[in-house]
Structures are given as C-alpha cells and as structure tokens.
Design a protein with these regions (language model features):
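Amphipathic alpha-helices that form helix-helix packing interfaces
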Residues: 29, 36, 66, 73, ...
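Conserved alpha-helical segments that form or flank metal/cofactor-binding pockets of metalloenzymes
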Residues: 53-94, 161-164, 168
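Extreme N-terminal tail/first-helix region
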Residues: 1-23
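Secondary-structure edge/capping motif, primarily at the C-terminal ends of alpha-helices
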Residues: 40-48, 77, 81, 108-111, ...
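Carboxylate-rich helix-loop segments that flank metal/cofactor sites and access channels
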Residues: 2-10, 72-128
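Preference for long, well-ordered alpha-helical segments
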Residues: 116-169
Length: 169
C-alpha cells in the first residue's frame, strides 16, 4: 500500500480508512450536486419567468459541473464515482436535500413562483449544510480547495434564491 498524506495531491488509491472516508464524503457531495442539478433542471423547465428559468438553468449546469469535478477526484482516489447512493458520513444531509428537491414538482403544479423559489431555497439550504459538514473532514489540500470553492458558489446561489423568494413573497 502506498503511503498517504493529507497535503497536496499525494493521497492515492488504497484501502486505508482515511482514503475511504474521503471517498465516502465526496460521493455524498456528488449525490447532493446530482440532486441539485435535477431540481434546478425541473424548476427551469417549469417556471414561466424567463429570467428565473435562465438562472435555474445556470445553477443546474453549475451543479452538474461540480458533480463531474468531484467524480474525477473520487476516481483518482480509486473509488467508483458513478454510484450516487447517499450512504456514509453525510447520508442524513443528502437525504434531507433529496426530500427538499422532491417537493419541487409539487411546487410547480400547485404553488406558483413563490412555492417554487421556497423549494429551491430549501434544497440549497440543505446543500450548504452538507458542504459545511463535509468541510469538517480532513481532505487533502487540493480536494479541500475544490470543496471550499463549490461551497462558496452554492452559498451564493442559496443567498440569491433566498432573496428572490423574499421579493416574490
């Protein structure tokens, strides 16, 4: 087995417990990004406001890009990134996120723009919390930097959607 450190890109595939924890955390974030991608796609397809639809499409694309970026790190660490099962360290957060985005279809059909924005806000709030928990993990520096950048972008999206929800209320 190769020696593993927590700095730079030196964590390589292996079976040690720390590597497994990093892979598990990243897989949970992949699930969170995947669910956010789907939620924002659904929101964009079902909202009549063109400005909001464009914003939601951009957030959907962002989450898809984040998902792919995290998958690359999982693959580099020897994990299988194609699995999007929410199991491991952040399963509760991923489950809460999924439940938040599941309600998006109900909001589209029954509650109009306010309900839709509320559901987007809930989904991003759960994502922010999941990323905060993930950042407590001892990631290698390069992965920690990626997760931190994604966290800040999701936090900005959350703040923006929250503001739009207040305007529409």
């Amino acid at each position: 087995m190769q020696n593993q450190t927590m700095s730079g890109s030196s964590v390589r595939s292996g079976s040690n417990e720390q590597n497994d924890k990093v892979v598990s955390s990243l897989k949970n974030l992949i699930e969170i990004c995947h669910t956010g991608h789907q939620g924002y796609t659904t929101a964009a397809e079902n909202i009549k406001n063109g400005e909001y639809a464009a914003l939601f499409r951009s957030y959907s694309a962002q989450r898809h890009a984040f998902e792919n970026e995290l998958k690359q790190h999982v693959n580099r660490l020897g994990g299988e990134a194609e699995s999007t099962n929410a199991s491991g360290l952040l399963a509760d957060a991923a489950g809460a996120l999924h439940r938040g985005w599941i309600n998006i279809k109900s909001a589209v059909t029954g509650g109009g723009i306010e309900a839709l924005l509320d559901e987007c806000e809930r989904g991003d709030e759960a994502a922010v919390k999941a990323y905060q928990e993930a950042l407590e993990q001892p990631f290698p520096q390069d992965i920690a930097q990626v997760v931190r950048q994604q966290y800040h972008s999701i936090q900005e999206a959350y703040t923006r959607v929250k503001g739009l929800a207040r305007i529409e209320a």
